[in-house]
């Protein structure tokens, strides 16, 4: 951990026998590792979704004296809403139901994101822990303010109208 760096930032330095990644925090390390994989191994942010082919290598030479310093983001919270998550939730990759979500969250991190709305309703709850475990901030869709369940799901027998049920 490098306390002199701003949040989410990293520095990569290479000398004769060491590749040193220092970061301000966990997300800084994640971004740094993904930058190493992009810059030196050619792994693109959308590698999974684009079926990027890979070849096995003996190793990779990184020039001595290489210094990579991340830049601060201009926007504090950067992310996306996994819309139509029901389509992802029915897709299994390598027999793992959560792998499409893991790959969506990894892509977000590779692009410099730090927050996600993993969907709405019951499906969203399934993937919040996965997103949080990957270091992402969880936020909510406008249909679920402060994480509240949608009215129609919570009260399926009532007409969803505030003027009739203000206490709900």
Stretches with model-predicted labels:
Residues 1, 79-81:
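Short hydrophobic beta-strand segments
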Residues 1-72:
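Contiguous, structured surface segment used for ligand recognition
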Residues 74, 81-168:
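Aromatic-lined carbohydrate-binding surfaces of glycoside hydrolases
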């Amino acid at each position: 951990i490098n306390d002199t760096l701003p949040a989410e930032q990293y520095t990569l330095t290479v000398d004769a026998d060491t590749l040193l990644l220092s970061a301000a925090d966990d997300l800084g390390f994640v971004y740094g590792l993904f930058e190493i994989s992009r810059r030196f191994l050619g792994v693109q942010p959308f590698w999974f979704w684009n079926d990027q082919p890979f070849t096995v290598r003996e190793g990779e030479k990184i020039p001595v004296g290489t210094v990579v310093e991340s830049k601060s983001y201009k926007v504090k919270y950067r992310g996306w809403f996994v819309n139509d998550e029901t389509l992802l939730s029915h897709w299994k990759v390598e027999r793992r139901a959560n792998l499409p979500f893991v790959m969506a969250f990894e892509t977000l991190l590779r692009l410099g994101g730090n927050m996600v709305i993993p969907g709405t309703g019951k499906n969203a709850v399934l993937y919040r822990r996965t997103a949080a475990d990957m270091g992402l901030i969880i936020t909510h869709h406008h249909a679920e303010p402060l994480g509240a369940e949608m009215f129609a799901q919570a009260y399926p027998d009532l007409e969803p109208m505030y003027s009739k049920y203000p206490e709900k």
